[in-house]
């Protein structure tokens, strides 16, 4: 990751920490243009879209993250949360179960499965 792209990525992460999701999207989209296959950028951008309530954009980022890293338990969980926000609970639960199988010690993942199953 070049210094400029890394700076944009760090700026976006800092904006997320400050609760500035919309500003983070701008920084992270610029970083993504420079490194479209960088999983860390895609993850942060997915989170920014999620926090902005932009479910389809978040879904696209988390799906791309899974293309880049299919065994990323958090990516499955985040995609599940995004799908659930769109009313797609059955599809979300598939990703929660995949996340839980990749990280069996996660109480958070198991809790989502239980809640969706009810």
Task: Put a short name on every predicted segment.
Residues 1-7:
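TPR-adjacent "capping" and linker segments in tetratricopeptide-repeat scaffold/adaptor proteins
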Residues 84-108, 114, 118:
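TPR/TPR-like (Sel1-like) alpha-helical repeat modules
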